Amino acid sequence: MKMKNIITLRDYIQQAEKSHSLERKQIIDLLDSNNPEILHQLCLAAGRCRRRWLFHETQLVCFFDFGEEAPDADGTERLILKAENAGFSKIILKRKQGDDFQTALWQHIANRCRQRRMQLILSLDKFNLTDINRLKDSGVYGFRCEAGTFNERIYRRIHKSKTSGNFSYLLKCLENIHDCGADLTIGFAVGIPGTTTSDIASDILYLPQLRPHNVEICRFSPEVDETLALKSIALVRLLNPRVTLTASPVLCNLPEAPFLEQLLAGADTVATSVMLPSMLSEICFHIKACGFTVNRDFEK
């Protein structure tokens, strides 16, 4: 890459940090750059932006995926109690595929979380505004959607959706979640087969329309270059300075680097299924080694 182009890209980064806005072509140019200096400058700018708007605190939240298990009231309540005892004040529950959220079970779980003053986030793949309002009234704090993308063609391919109505209704629901007073967490992936940096740029620019409280960015598969995810995280931070950004989940053992690199790229939240005090202490140690503090529940 010519020096003139590097200087231009640095100007883009300065513009993003100052005005929190970029044009689509500028985002594409930054994503396409293979110069490590550009990644470094992006992460530095995103880190400054995070500290300016969200200070140094990193939030630890509990994440539990039921997978194919059918959740029951007693088991879920034990999980909530275990998370509370570990120090978590927010818990994300991801339901199994096809599970029905219109049952009294989930309203019961939401009520139990509210009684314990824990914030419950439900991860959904199908949205219905009536159900969302009912669950919100039961005590659900927010909703999480792993859309993957906001491009209808790509969405229908990765979710095997046969009708455009599903996609249109999903966007309508997401755009209205904020109005019902619930938090909205949006997840999208980079490196989806058949996509380009132009598609990623479009997803990044679409985010403000959904007014999310939290954004999760991940690689579509382990084979996708982590650099692309780091750049995307940094750009979302620069263009959306007030949003919270979640790093890759820590699901069992500590990963070698990803979530720490993502914190340095602008993420401020770590989701984990780890509840052992010794492992939580290790996660907190690494977060502090990056120059951040941890939410006070884990400073006891």
Stretch-by-stretch model annotation:
Residues 128-137, 193-208, 252-265:
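Catalytic cores of alpha/beta
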Residues 1-37, 84, 116, 208-300:
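Auxiliary Fe-S-binding modules of radical SAM enzymes
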Residues 67, 71-75, 79, 83-173, ...:
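Core AdoMet radical
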Residues 21, 26-81, 85-91:
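N-terminal [4Fe-4S]-dependent radical SAM core
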Residues 67-70, 97-102, 191-196, 221-226, ...:
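Short, small-residue-enriched loops and turns at beta-alpha junctions
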Residues 76-80, 106-110, 132, 171-174, ...:
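Generic structural signal for well-ordered alpha-helices
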Residues 93, 142, 168-246, 273-274:
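Conserved C-terminal portion of the radical SAM core fold
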Residues 50, 54-72, 107-122, 171-191, ...:
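Mobile, glycine- and charge-enriched loop segments
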